[in-house]
């Protein structure tokens, strides 16, 4: 779990203590299960090597699975299902919804494994809305008010928002 200290990881990175640094997508205690599985795999399969190159190793659901869940839950029947093959059209719709202070649940492909939501299972909302934190914490997540939120910005815009910004795909430093 020591690699989950993102503040320490960031200091290691920006102070150039090492030529290269890699912090995995599951740097906390949960990552130990991945390490154990890889060691066991390696012991049993001496001629091959398992390499997990993506954090998106969690469960996945088909469109039919999702429709069934929504149609069988009274609380979810109010939601309409619409499929988008054009990603730009979907992105524009999401941007408009967020701009109009709607909260958007984003569900895409496989679930990420690790301490951070990396985009495949996300709650998206307008950060300019003064009461959005309370809405998400109380009404949607039903959690304590002190829980943190993470901003999402385009990679190309990172230097406009952060000092010492760097490529950090797993938000671990």
Language-model features, listed with the residues they occupy:
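Glycine-rich phosphate-binding loops at beta-strand->alpha-helix junctions
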Residues: 1-11
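Flexible beta->alpha loop and helix N-cap segments adjacent to enzyme active/binding sites
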Residues: 9-173
């Amino acid at each position: 779990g020591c690699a989950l200290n993102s503040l320490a990881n960031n200091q290691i990175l920006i102070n150039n203590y090492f030529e290269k640094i890699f912090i995995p997508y599951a740097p906390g205690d949960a990552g130990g299960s991945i390490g154990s599985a890889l060691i066991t795999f390696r012991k049993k399969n001496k001629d091959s090597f398992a390499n997990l190159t993506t954090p998106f190793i969690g469960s996945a659901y088909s469109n039919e699975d999702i429709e069934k869940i929504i149609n069988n839950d009274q609380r979810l029947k109010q939601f309409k299902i619409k499929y988008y093959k054009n990603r730009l059209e979907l992105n524009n719709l999401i941007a408009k919804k967020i701009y109009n202070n709607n909260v958007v649940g984003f569900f895409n492909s496989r679930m990420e494994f690790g301490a951070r939501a990396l985009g495949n299972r996300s709650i998206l909302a307008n950060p300019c809305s003064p009461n959005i934190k309370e809405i998400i914490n109380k009404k949607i997540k039903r959690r304590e008010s002190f829980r943190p939120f993470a901003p999402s910005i385009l990679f190309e815009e990172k230097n406009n928002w952060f000092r010492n910004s760097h490529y950090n795909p797993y938000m671990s430093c």
